[in-house]
Amino acid sequence: MSAFSVEKIGLQDSQQFSKLFIDYLAQQEHIQPLYTFYPDMAGLETAIEKRSKQPINRTVLVERLKAQYKDLPVSEKVQQNIERLASEHTFTITTGHQLCLGTGPLYLILKTLSCVKLCEALKTKHADNEFVPVFWMASEDHDAAEINHFYVFGKKYTWETTQTGAVGRFTTTGISEVLETIKDIPAWLKDAYQSSVTLAEATRKVMHQLFAEYGVVVIDGDDAALKKEFTAVIEKELFEQPAVAVMNQTNRSIERHGYSIQVNPRDINLFYVKDSLRERIEKQGERFVVLHTDVSFSAGEIKKEVADHPERFSPNVVLRPLYESTILPDIAYVGGPGEIAYWLQLKEVFAVYNTFLPAIFPRMFSGVITKQQCVKLEKAHVTVAELFLSEFDLKQVVVSRSIQEEISIEAEAGKITAAFDTIASIAATVDGSLQSWAQAEKAKALKQLEDIEKKLRKAEERKHDDVIKSVLGIRDKILPNGKLQERQESVFTFLVNDAQLIEKLYQSLDPCTFNIQMCCYE
């Protein structure tokens, strides 16, 4: 099996990323106070040293992972990695995502492979340690509209459901009917949803099918025993509310440097979860109120509720990273630009809760270009990098390379300029007022020449319209709606025609190269 040929596009050149993200990777001085470890191998090695001094409850972690996997035929690599987590010499590199139908966009695959490859790279340098890639299921999120669809070959497939609350607890009713409408979708994907009661159960099966051979461990944080490890943070957030003040201070600093804020904290950064309910908790007077319900607690009552039912308290986006770092021996979190933006807001929140802040590592960025598309680009003499140009500039590139001789009136314009300058000089000797007239006539002549050039170019564009349409069509596949392909298309767009796609991506991509790595079939 041959891997892809890879063409690298600079992140800044692509015009797809925020200034904060670019400046973070460039190690700009004013960004450095927002993180502890820079995302490179040296930073990860320092994180290993620091993380080893902040232990977690590994016994509970291993027990709960085994329980979560009990109904699944676990691969040998995954089983080994779960067992390895019992050792203090084992560390995790984690990514997470919502429980999107059909895994959602391709970048979920890239995030997960980033974890796998970083773990393998560290193992070659630290033979005495073990490194486990972990996928965190965001099963407690409650935004159904963000997870109920995916795209295959540019078409959106949507699962309509009226269920509410934590999405991991949703039943899978109706998903099979959606998948039946998709041609050539793998049978195992349909079976994963058909054989599962909940969306969390189905998502674990899907991720296990895709990544079991790489040893990826899937964890569900919606777990009472794991939440019990987080109760100290839950109680402190309820009664002292320290996160909001320190995070707002960080946010003001970020805004002073001209960046946008990704996340704003609440006074209490917790939801109350029960059955199909997930609503924010707010302190109103002396009581803790669950918004949009008639549920409320006194201080004593909510303290008892935390002790008896920690699973009913769900961290929001501010505290979820702390929850992950509390129950996992993380040395790094792998995320996209948006995730990294809000992780950079959290350093002081981690500090106020005395929780380890892992390295914040960017995921790999990529896209897939078919063999047919590569051939068409080659015939048009267009590079992959040039697909990231504006539509106007890309058209100019196609036209200029499709014609035998460049259309340019530069030489003729020079001749006209010289001729009129001579005329102007002669006119000045006859009558000074005629000189400005001659210069005005020169401007008119040059403008007419420019109009002629535009008409010639338009005629040339029409002549090469088929080539232009072909190239722009490829561009629309690589950058649908102007965004990276990985942000829309599902992995199943490509798995349908190439069952080895994930292995090829694994073989071809480098997690420490901060570029867009476009993968071309050879």
UniProtKB/Swiss-Prot annotation:
InterPro entries per record: Bacillithiol_biosynth_BshC, CC_BshC, Rossmann-like_BshC
Pfam family, one: Rossmann-like_BshC
E.C. designation(s): 6.-.-.-
Keywords: Coiled coil, Ligase
Coiled coil: 436-469
Enzyme class: ligase
UniProt KW Protein biosynthesis keyword: no
Keyword Coiled coil part of the UniProt annotation: yes
Protein name: Putative cysteine ligase BshC
Gene of this entry: bshC
Similarity comment text for this entry: Belongs to the BshC family.
Species assigned in the record: Cytophaga hutchinsonii (strain ATCC 33406 / DSM 1761 / CIP 103989 / NBRC 15051 / NCIMB 9469 / D465)
